[in-house]
Each structure stands twice: as C-alpha cells, then as structure tokens.
Amino acid sequence: MSGDPTITDPTTWARDREIVLVRVLDATRDAVFAAWTDSDAFCQWFGPDGFSCTVREMDVRPGGRACFDMVSRDGTVYTNRFDYLEVVPAERLVLDHGSDTDDDPARFRVTIALDEQHDGTTMLTLRQLHPTVEQRDTKIGFGAVELGLQTLQKLAHHLKTA
C-alpha cells in the first residue's frame, strides 16, 4: 500500500475527508431502509429541493448497483450511480456514490446507519468519505451539507406521508 488516502482502504478513513449528516426520523428502521432500497419510494424523496429523480436500475445487494438521474428545475440531468458494497436490511448500507461512469475520480464512499431509538423513531447517520480533503472541501463549497439536509428533510416528509 502506498499510504495515500483512498475510499477503498478502511485504514485511511479520516475525519478531514468526511461529511456526516444525522437525522432522527419518525419511522421504523424497516420503513427507512425501504425508502432507500425500493426504486419507487426512492424517487419520491431523493435529491435536494427542486430536483426530480428517475431510477434506471436498482439492484440492492453487495455487488449490485443503482443507476438514476437527478433532474434540476432547469432540466439539467445529473447521472448518478451507487455501487453497493454492504447491505444489512434495516441496519446499514455501504456504497460508493458517483456519476454513472466507470472510474469517476469524484466517487465517494457512503455509509448509512439506521439506529432504532427507544421511542420508535430511527436515527439515520449518513457518512460520506471523500478521496481527498480537497474534494470534500469542494463538495462543501457547492452546498453538499445544505443540499444533503434538504434531501433528508424530503425523506422525513416522505416517511410521514407514505
């Protein structure tokens, strides 16, 4: 190993390359997990305000992938791909997220943990690990935290109305 940080080497996980979002959701872990893994449910909430979503493929299993488009108000299409690494129903998803191209240098690791709370709610912790500090800082600079929080707000609304 070269010692250079990568998203594939867990020994290089570093907080300076990480974005963490947390949201307590008024839903069971099963319902939250289904919102992430059912293609119809996923597109009802995924993406920041003003974006729509279309799933082209969703195969949620280790080694599977989801390919989907996020479309902005002005019609700009952003292709996306999740490559699933770990799937533990109602508990955890680990995936690599990037554009729907092979060898995307901006691809980052996402870990979604679902923790049931004593009151029946679910705490969702979403951790993004970016390949470099610079890439993380660039994402923060264009609003990744705010847009991510908008997305989790849409998830909360979806779960209340589902």
What are these regions (language model features)?
Residues V20-L21, D40-V77:
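Short beta-edge strand/loop motif at the mouth of beta-sheet-based domains
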Residues R23, V55-M58, N80-E86, F108-E116:
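Hydrophobic/aromatic beta-strand elements that line small-molecule binding cavities or substrate pockets
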Residues D16-V22, R29, C53, R65, ...:
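Intrinsic-disorder/low-complexity, polar/charged segments enriched in Ser/Thr/Lys/Arg/Asp/Glu/Gln
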Residues V94, S99-L149:
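Beta-strand/loop substructures that line and gate deep hydrophobic ligand-binding cavities in soluble
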Residues H158-A162:
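Short, highly charged C-terminal tails/helix-capping segments
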Residues M1-S52:
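Hydrophobic ligand-binding cavity/cleft-lining segments
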Residues V32, F42, A66-F68, Y84, ...:
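Hydrophobic pocket/interface hotspot
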Residues R29-D30, V60-R61, L85-R92, A113-M123:
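A short, structured loop/turn motif at beta-sheet edges
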